[in-house]
Regions:
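Flexible, glycine/small-residue-enriched loop-and-beta-strand segment within the central core
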Residues: 2-6, 10-11, 17, 23-27, ...
Length: 140
């Protein structure tokens, strides 16, 4: 996999050999993606981000510059992180308010916006359709 689609001026990207990067992904300069992480298609990750181990991002996700996503986090479709956002270990984003295994509901994705400089603590759950304000701090 590891077919990173990036502008030619993005040279200092580190992607661990166990990470999977799908097609149509943009990864900014200075970003690091660690062990067993998966970035799905049509996702953009800004410059100087640190993506921990066992992280899933996408599809169709936008992550700003300088973000840190700790281990075991899933950033699902509908989530946007502005610059300098911190996502603590094992925190959770939801993207469908009323999920059901037997009923397909991807047409009901509710967007979540995390604004500049926000911090989300370990094991916190962010319900979809939420906007987290600039520099807010969410505890578990």
């Amino acid at each position: 996999m590891n077919s990173v689609k990036q502008p030619s001026n993005r040279e200092n990207v580190f992607v661990h050999q166990s990470a999977a990067i799908d097609n149509h992904v943009i990864i900014g300069d200075g970003t690091k993606i660690w062990h067993f992480s998966h970035v799905l298609s049509h996702t953009s990750i800004g410059e100087r981000c640190n993506i921990g181990q066992n992280v899933v991002i996408g599809p169709d996700v936008a992550i700003g510059r300088g973000c840190t996503i700790q281990n075991n986090v899933s950033v699902y479709k509908g989530v946007t992180l502005e610059d300098d956002v911190f996502c603590g270990p094992s925190m959770v984003f939801t993207n469908i308010y009323n999920p059901r295994a037997a009923i397909r509901k991807m047409d009901q994705v509710r967007p979540t916006l995390v604004k500049h400089g926000a911090t989300i603590g370990a094991n916190a759950t962010i319900v979809c359709g939420t906007t987290l304000g600039r520099y807010c701090f969410i505890g578990a």
